[in-house]
Amino acid sequence: MNPKRCAACKYLRRRCPKDCVFSPYFPPNDPQKFACVHRIYGAGNVSKMLQQLPDQTRAEAVESLCFEAKCRVDDPVYGCVGIIHLLKTQIQKTQNELAKTQAEIAVAQTKLSQTQNSDFM
């Protein structure tokens, strides 16, 4: 048993076994991290997911679950899809602005070359 229980075991009010699947990813000093994930996915589902993954990918999976759970808590309707949509909209606006600026540059370059050509004649 770990001398300090991980955030998951504290939240679930149980002893933290030596081989606790949660302890490497939910430290005792960050209880909100597990609470958010538990609220959205449930401890049992998260435990099953982590046990099915290779050890080297578990940390990334936990970070992804935490991010998605926080997004779902913040925006229950859209979750992280709302952020994705917002970012896609910003990208589209920026691409449109870039295209407009490039067109303005092309027009200015054309006018400049016409002016230079007429000066030589």
UniProtKB/Swiss-Prot annotation:
It comes from the Eukaryota. It comes from Arabidopsis thaliana. PROSITE patterns: LOB. Residues 4-105 form the LOB domain. Belongs to the LOB domain-containing protein family. This is LOB domain-containing protein 24. The gene is LBD24.
